[in-house]
Amino acid sequence: MAKIKARDLRGKKKEELLKQLDDLKVELSQLRVAKVTGGAASKLSKIRVVRKSIARVLTVINQTQKENLRKFYKGKKYKPLDLRPKKTRAMRRRLNKHEEGLKTKKQQRKERLYPPRKYAVKA
């Protein structure tokens, strides 16, 4: 089997990808048997290509799965931890913009009763 390109895999359905994955795994097992029994050098060099192809198929499957989950949870209140933005621990605990702007009743009263003084400069 020739080297598989990820862009060709992205258009396929999940069933097709899983079938291709099974085919690649079967081919890999056959190549490993050939390696043990002393197969040709061309078969031995093909093991690497097949392994990388399996990795590509699995990567595409996982990426599409995660993309679908992102669409599903978009706009929901709670999201799974792996779909939330990866920030530092301190950034996750920081107040958001709305919470930063909130003022206590006492602070609001103080600002209302004692507004900043404005001075007129005589020219």
Curated annotation (Swiss-Prot):
Record flagged with keyword Ribonucleoprotein: yes
UniProt KW keywords: Cytoplasm, Ribonucleoprotein, Ribosomal protein
Localization per record: Cytoplasm
GO biological process: maturation of LSU-rRNA from tricistronic rRNA transcript (SSU-rRNA, 5.8S rRNA, LSU-rRNA); translation
Biased composition (Basic residues): 86-96
Principal subcellular localisation of the protein: cytoplasm
Chain segments carrying region Disordered: 84-123
Tree of life domain: Eukaryota
Pfam families linked to this entry: Ribosomal_L29
Molecular-function GO term, any one: mRNA binding
Keyword Ribonucleoprotein attached: yes
Subunit structure: Component of the large ribosomal subunit.
Known function: Component of the large ribosomal subunit. The ribosome is a large ribonucleoprotein complex responsible for the synthesis of proteins in the cell.
Record family assignment: Belongs to the universal ribosomal protein uL29 family.
Protein name according to UniProt: Large ribosomal subunit protein uL29
Organism, as annotated: Ophiophagus hannah (King cobra)
